[in-house]
Amino acid sequence: MTQELEKTFASELEKNQSIIHKVCRSYTNNEPAHKDLFQEITIQLWKAYPKFRGESKFSTWMYRVAFNTAISLYRKSKRNVETTQIYDNLKELEYHDYDDSKDRQLSLLYKAIYSLNDIEKALALLYLEDKSYKEISETLGISEVNARVKMNRTKTKLKNILNP
């Protein structure tokens, strides 16, 4: 990779690193796992960057790589760890980027998102980023109509989790 390409990558990564943190919060439930996943996603982005063609926004491409990496690692770890009740093992998450008044709500939201399946997690995060259905469909590789249907189901599922 050329120095100019490296600088461009570093700049884009810096501007969009919150995307990686959001994906990590949805697929991990503790700080060490969050850091490990963040590092793995960054490595995968670095490896894949020379193949980035610019046909979509960098952030859209970044989401796709981040989700694929998270899902892949999540599935691998699922095979290695005995399944337990997720809610029993969740600890309060700390979010240093937000003021104290929003911590509890944000923690509850991320716990709810954490309990969703892989596609639903991705949909919820992209929705929270105000992505259009077109952008969501491109990021996840599904049709726009399918994105709308899945999004409505995911919203309903989240409402039921948050307001039992």
What are the roles of these predicted feature ranges?
Residues K51-R53, R64-T84, K102, R153:
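Arg/Lys-rich amphipathic alpha helix in sigma70-family domain 2
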Residues I41, V65, L123-A124, I136-S137, ...:
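Hydrophobic positions on the alpha-helical face of helix-turn-helix-like DNA-binding modules
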Residues S115-E135, T139:
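Short amphipathic alpha helix immediately N-terminal
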Residues T2-Q3, T42-K57, K76-S77:
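Sigma70-family region 2
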Residues M1-K22, S26, K35:
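A short, charge-rich alpha-helical start-of-domain segment used by transcription regulators
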Residues N80-L106, S132-Y133:
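Internal acidic/polar
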Residues L140-P164:
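DNA-recognition helix of helix-turn-helix
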Residues D36-I43, S56-N68:
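Structural recognition of an alpha-helix C-terminal capping motif at a helix-to-coil junction
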